[in-house]
């Protein structure tokens, strides 16, 4: 009923109902809220999938869906949200892989998709996120190597990749991410799977 009420206000710019006891699903008609800038639904009990129609919300700056019971894949249409600065999908039941279209989010500062069942490789297109400050993908089933393209994320301050199935070596480009500051937090699994002998790899 709350969703039905919200959909009656097409000029709405902010929806913040985080940390409640909301249940139900995200309906495709949410794409009708074309003026929406903030959609904050975290820490509820929402279920179902993330509809692709969310990509129609071209004004969206903040999308918070963390700590719900969402499942399925991250829709590729999220890559159409060119004004998005924060994307928090953490602690759901999302699976499949990270879509390469995430690399289209040129203004993104936070990407948190931690603690669920995402698989596959980290897409090299994440290296396009030059404004990214925080990247948290810990606690998934991601595999493959850590892409060297992450070295292009020149604003990055924190990167958490531990508790995955990543392998290989972290390249020197990671330690060169900041010109004026050190990379504050780089967390990986430093035993057997990932070789991290770099000075900036301060935590395992």
Residue ranges and their predicted role:
Residues 1-4, 26-28, 47-52, 71-76, ...:
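The feature encodes a structural signal of leucine-rich repeats
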Residues 1-38, 49, 55-60, 79-84, ...:
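Leucine-rich repeat
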Residues 15-17, 36-41, 60-65, 84-89, ...:
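Conserved hydrophobic beta-strand positions in leucine-rich repeat
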Residues 64, 82-145:
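Eukaryotic tandem repeat interaction scaffolds
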Residues 154-204:
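Leucine-rich solenoid repeat scaffolds
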